Swiss-Prot record:
Superkingdom: Eukaryota
Protein's cellular compartments: Mitochondrion membrane
Single GO MF descriptor: ATP binding
Topology of this chain in the membrane: Peripheral membrane protein
Protein name: Kinesin-like protein KIF28
Functional note: Microtubule-dependent motor protein required for mitochondrion morphology and transport of mitochondria in neuronal cells.
Upper lineage: Eukaryota, Metazoa, Chordata, Craniata, Vertebrata
SMART domains, per database record: KISc
Record organism: Rattus norvegicus
Length: 1034
């Protein structure tokens, strides 16, 4: 205080950004999906586990950590509190005690204070900042305690509190306390001493916390209306609430000024670009760029704090970073609260948030106390400035920044009086609305942001109530997909009905309706593309329902269920496990999230006359790899150009990026009716590309027995539906290219170890290609990859034929067959991919610089050097090891029997030939009574014996083939058992032991069943053979 009285500049205080993390409970959608918690917390440390790999664990430590996931209950007032004394649950009061009080302390001392809420959409940012119902968040609690403290000190100081609320969307600033919107948004100006500020932003003087609470409600309503009209989700905008707090100490002629900024940042998943690398318009949206630039600023400041050389801090790259310049690396005490989802399906986003917070805590600020000892001189100068209408105020002392914002409004008392008059008018409107809520049925808006749900109420008066885009309608909606005359609600005889007009899209409880439909209390209604409302019936129909369960997710899940979309459609739990696969759940969540976005994109395409139809698909929904295992599923969007039939496939990330750009173009169209854009900048256009249509699986077991294979196999698309039929031949051959015959068939594939194998893959034809039926100008190519080839081989393009003949052969050679290659042939399929060509697209073709060729010019396979697997001691899985040894001995015995039977077959063949050429009297067969039939009988028996011999050989070959296939699987399981190591985490030992026990049991069952099956088959074959070896009639 002495230095302040002497007029000296206060000494800056260096502080690091304080970082807190908070883990929310499961959402209803996550509960319904059976999500698992992947986060644990100990003191201030957060540990996150990869749901796909339990051994991959990462730990982070922060200044503050709050566990709000479980261990809570509601008290009689609806406040969430710990369920028992041992619970580690942190409620709203705990968060405020550490963070909110810190903000207040800084403000009273004269420091600027900033609070940033960061996290993915739905992670609980708004709940921590504002809260819901009785569980008030940081912002209302800060305001309440600020005015309570002012009241206690009103005798010794004069306190002035001013409030503003703004939104940043697409690099435009909207004043949420002003009902008029400036064209292009408010502008950010820069002053040499003041830094960046928003020109023309409305500041409202406040004298109690109730007034601020109502201003927040007013701002939320304007924000909701604006986002509806602009088709802009609030999750993609930043909301900034600012409080200017000025203390005038009456006894010391001293002032302290503090700026409190509380920012609810846009959903952090929006900045991620992974998966959109192939998009030529990558990061084209300014919505994406603002959070990306914020990350760049934080990274640069973190590097600076660590002593690295940083040439430039990119504050000027976005509106958001300009306004947060003082909060990050400047004159402010800053806290960042990172909101986390604990669900396994949100693992990637949660890990990204933790890493972001880890960088932020390295940023260092230099906060100073904002004081001015010359308050009287300041007021005199301010009066002089007001005489000039406030012109040139920005060029004067920084001590007058608050007065500069006031402009010509007059004294503080006059400002308060003006605010009271405005408040009284708003209060009368709010009171009238609250009275109507009690007596009239109405529609309650439901938004993706829970903070904006219930902000809009549309009352359905007696008679007919029209809904549409036109201003003459009783309910005017400017949102996407709303017609001028969209639908009508009728309130008559105690019943409310809804009837869509000809072009109006109306969905009730997930189902589209086309005729007048009676509404029941709590019915869910979607108008147009995605304007969601909850119908609140007459007072007599209402009860003590929990309206919170009808959230945005509920609407979308209901809509998906009506369209037949469910987790079961994507695949259920793993065998022996009741829990659904986390990757399947994540795909399902992505599908639900993208559903409304695709509907909106189609509507924009229609209104902008772009002629695109977008459909949500699941990549690899019914696809498998060469071993028959399911491929990783992901959501994609199929885009079709109506008229030209051009088709594109967009990844999830690419579609989201394009959707941002579509919104920008659509907004420009709404404002100026101009949607013209250069083709290369058009988010609705892409160059044509090659598309993957489907895959066919050709199993290679026959090659391991040197048997020819000729098949017609279906090409199945990602949904498991037939796209075409493949005619293919796989022929084992000699090094000269001659096909092997039956005499070259190998019963035991192990005989091929270390030997050379040659084979040819001949793709003959594709039949009934739907891609070509739809448009005769299209073409196809086929691609496949054999074992360890470094690249895929493609056939030549074939155009304009529904049944295109390919007729391409490739000769392959394995010079020394390895056990791994043999196992590949026994257990894998050749996956042939069908690719669709469009007019103007480039053909598929890959150079083969790494492919090895034999001296004859054939492609070499099985060229890898395999590392041997370490042997294990006999005491590791000893029982199975002994069984495997015994099984190998019995297998060798069966091979001996097989060799003896083959020798006997040769002898019988020779004896049969001798019997056919010997005189009739010398034949071993009994002479029949009919001499003429003797020759016929002998010949018939000879044919029968030959047929039986061939049948026995083929049956034995099949039996051994099945047995060796089972043994290959058993060897693979044994290798996996040998390679398994117990986890270091004690908590994972029980699942590990359970998994190992199950694997041992499966292997034991496989060995036992394979052996019994082989014994049974061989016994049956030997019995049948002996029956035909015995002389007939003896």
């Amino acid at each position: 205080m002495d230095c302040e009285k002497m007029g000296k500049l206060p000494v800056p205080r260096t502080d690091s950004v304080r970082v807190a993390v908070r883990v929310r409970p499961f959402s209803q959608r996550e509960k319904n999906s059976g999500s698992q918690c992947v986060i644990s917390m100990h003191a201030r440390s957060i540990t996150i586990r990869d749901p796909k790999d339990a051994e991959l664990v990462k730990t982070f430590t922060f200044d503050l950590a709050y566990w709000s996931h479980d261990g809570f209950q509601k008290d009689e007032d609806g406040v969430l509190i710990p369920s028992d004394p041992t619970s580690k649950f942190a409620g709203q009061s705990d968060v405020f005690h550490d963070i909110g009080r810190g903000i207040l302390d800084s403000a009273w001392q004269g420091y600027n204070a900033t609070l940033l809420a960061y996290g993915q959409t739905g992670s609980g940012k708004s709940y921590s900042m504002i809260g819901y119902g009785a569980n008030k968040g940081i912002i209302p609690r800060v305001c309440e305690e600020l005015f309570q403290a002012i009241e206690k000190q009103k005798e010794s100081l004069e306190a002035q509190v001013m409030f503003s609320m703004l939104e940043i969307y697409n690099e435009q600033i909207r004043d949420l306390l002003s009902r008029t919107k400036a064209p292009g948004g408010l502008r950010v100006r820069e002053d040499q001493r003041l830094g960046f500020f928003v020109e023309g932003l409305k500041w409202v003087p406040c004298e109690d916390s109730v007034q601020i609470e109502k201003l927040v409600e007013q701002g939320s309503k304007i924000r909701m209306t604006a986002s509806t009209n602009m088709n802009a989700s609030s999750s993609r905008s930043h909301m900034l609430i600012a409080i200017r707090f000025k203390q005038v100490f009456l006894d010391t002629a001293l002032t302290k000024q503090s700026s409190i900024n509380m920012v609810d940042l846009a959903g952090s998943e929006r900045q991620r670009s992974s998966g959109s690398e192939g998009d030529r318009l990558r990061e084209g949206s300014r919505v994406n760029l603002s959070l990306t630039n914020l990350g760049n600023v934080i990274s640069a400041l973190a590097d600076l704090a660590m002593g690295k050389k940083v040439l430039h801090i990119p504050y000027r790259d976005s509106v958001l970073t300009k306004l947060l310049q003082s909060a990050l690396g400047g004159n402010s005490r800053t806290t960042l609260i990172a909101a986390l989802s604990p669900a396994d399906i949100c693992y990637e986003e949660t890990l990204s948030t933790l890493r972001y917070a880890e960088r932020a805590k390295k940023v260092r600020n230099r906060a100073v106390i904002n004081t001015c000892p010359l308050v009287r001189a300041s007021r005199a100068e301010n009066a002089l400035l007001l005489g000039f209408g406030g012109a040139g105020a920005a060029e004067h002392s920084a001590c007058f920044w608050a007065e500069q914002q006031l402009g010509t409004w007059g004294t503080w008392a006059q400002l308060l009086e003006q605010a009271r008059r405005e408040w009284e008018q708003q209060y009368m409107a709010l009171a009238q609305e609250q009275q109507m809520v009690k007596i009239l049925p109405h529609l309650l808006n439901v938004n993706e942001d829970p903070q904006l749900t219930g902000v809009l109420k549309f009352f359905i008066h007696n008679g007919s109530c029209e809904v549409g885009r036109a201003a003459s309608n009783a309910i005017c909606l400017q949102s996407l997909g709303i017609s001028d005359k969209h639908a009508s609600f009728t309130n008559m005889d105690g019943k409310v009905t809804v009837a869509p007009h000809i072009t109006g899209k109306v969905i009730v409880n997930g189902v589209p309706v086309s005729s007048r439909t009676k509404l029941q209390h709590l019915d869910r209604i979607i108008l147009g593309s995605n304007s969601a409302f909850l119908y609140i019936g007459f007072p007599s129909e209402r009860g003590a329902e929990d309206l919170g369960r009808f959230d945005y997710d509920f609407f979308q899940m209901e809509r998906a269920a009506a369209e037949g979309v469910s987790v079961d459609m994507l695949g259920t739990a793993s065998p022996g496990d009741d829990q659904a696969d986390p990757s399947i759940l994540a795909v399902f969540q992505d599908y639900i999230k993208l559903m409304p976005l695709v509907v909106e994109a189609n509507q924009m395409s229609e209104e902008l006359k772009k002629g695109l139809k977008m459909e949500l698909k699941v990549k690899n929904l019914a696809s498998s790899d060469s071993r028959g295992c399911d491929l990783q599923k992901e959501v994609m969007v199929k885009v079709t150009k109506q008229g030209t039939h051009e088709v594109w496939i967009w990844s999830k990330a690419k579609f989201i990026n394009r959707k941002f750009l579509m919104e920008e173009l659509y907004q420009r169209f709404l404002e100026s009716r101009d949607s013209h854009v250069a083709q290369e900048d058009d988010p609705f256009w892409d160059p044509v590309e090659v598309l993957h249509l489907g895959s066919a699986h050709v199993w290679l077991q026959s090659l391991a027995h040197r048997m020819m294979l000729e098949e017609q196999v279906e090409f199945l698309n990602c949904e498991g539906l037939e796209e075409a039929v493949l005619h293919i031949q796989i022929t084992p051959c000699s090094p000269e290219g001659w096909a092997h015959g039956e005499e070259d068939t190998v019963i035991d594939p192990l005989e091929l170890l270390g030997k050379r194998i040659d084979f040819q893959i001949h793709i003959v034809q594709c039949l009934g290609v739907k891609w070509l039926k739809e448009d005769a100008t299209r073409g196809i190519q086929l691609g496949y990859k054999v074992y360890d080839l470094p690249n895929t081989l493609y056939t030549k393009p074939v155009w304009q034929s529904v049944n295109p003949r390919v007729e391409e052969s490739v000769h392959f050679a394995a010079l020394g067959v390895s056990r791994e290659f043999l196992n590949y042939l026994l257990t894998n399929a050749l996956v042939v991919d069908l690719w669709g060509l469009q007019e103007g697209c480039a053909h598929l073709g890959v150079s083969q610089p790494d492919v090895l060729f034999t001296g004859e010019g054939y492609i070499m396979v099985d060229t890898k050097t395999f590392s041997s697997v370490k042997d294990i001691t006999s005491n590791q899985v000893p029982e199975l090891y002994q069984k495997l040894l015994k099984l190998e001995q019995e297998t060798e015995l069966l091979r001996d029997i097989n060799r003896a039977l083959r020798g006997e077959n040769v002898y019988l063949k020779a004896a049969l030939e001798n019997a056919g050429s010997a005189p009739q009297g010398e034949r071993r067969y009994h002479k029949p009574d009919n001499p003429e039939g003797a020759t016929v009988t002998a010949a018939g028996e000879a044919k029968q014996m030959c047929a039986q011999r061939a049948s026995s050989d083929s049956q034995l070959a099949r039996a051994l083939k099945v047995f060796y296939g089972g043994m290959s699987v058993a060897r693979g399981q044994l290798l996996r058992l040998r390679q398994c190591r117990p986890p270091e985490d004690d908590q994972m030992l029980r699942p590990f032991v359970h998994q190992q026990s199950q694997m041992l049991k499966d292997l034991e069952d496989l060995l036992e069943s394979s052996l019994q099956k082989l014994k049974s088959d061989v016994a049956f074959i030997v019995k049948k053979k002996k029956e035909y070896l015995l002389p007939r009639g003896r």
